Amino acid sequence: MFEKITLAHKDLFSRFLSAQKIVLSDVSFTNCFLWQHARLIQVAVIRDCLVIQTTYKNQKPFYFYPIGKNAFECVEELLKLEKNLRFHSLTLEQKDDLKDNFVGVFDFTYNRDRSDYVYSIEELIALKGKKYHKKKNHLNQFLTNYANFVYEKISPQNKKEVLEASQAWFLESQTDDIGLINENKGIQSVLENYESLDVKGGLVRVNGEIVSFSFGEVLNEESALIHIEKARTDIAGAYQIINQQLLLNEFSHLTYANREEDLGLEGLRRSKMSYNPVFLIDKYEAIARN
């Protein structure tokens, strides 16, 4: 019933996701495609709903909320298939729907580590006011030191160069962090299949050399979803410039930027909070009692 996710499933995702407003980063096709190296991600259509199943090594699978008109019927089928059925990354509305329609069936918990951070695109481009003072200083330092910088869209012509830069920075980091190793594999997968995905990306050059890059996609009619942002750590302001330039050049017609979760990592949480999110999308987990 379930199939391991491949590029061939992109149209299937598009068919279901386009029928309703998606706000979570988790269920984007690009997000699933990027992170398939970190866990087994499988998909199926059950009761005319898209079902995404995720399994980490040596763990039981979990599911995202079914995407489609017959979500409750789909949940009933999943309860038959899976003992102690587990859902992750439920919105408050989805959690309440399960609680109200499957009374006493599930136990629920709030998972702060998975909350999506959502920012004002207008604010991140302008960086005005006291709350952005440090970020603006970093940006101004970059603009002063590298006034000749060039922004380019990621394209078939330069994606190989982006991949080479990404790989070089990864090797220089000498990391043994499995999350970063899998992220690196995911970046490679996205760049190698760039034209087939609905992503918009950009890079910044200084004296012809790539110093930062980022890519994301349109999530819904008001929001962008930023998947990846990478920069040279020895160049002050390299992260701030690509953050600003990607939003300015690719997503300025939208209102919000979803920059995904912090995974409970203290440094990542500090970094994400320092950009002053306008709100967080809370996520919940559910486990069936059977």
Question: Language-model segments: what does each one mean?
Answer:
Residues D26-Q94, R205-T233:
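Conserved donor-binding loop and adjoining core beta-sheet/short helix segment
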Residues G104-D176:
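Acyltransferase donor/substrate-recognition loop-hinge adjacent to the catalytic core
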Residues A8-Q36:
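Intrinsically disordered, low-complexity, positively charged segments
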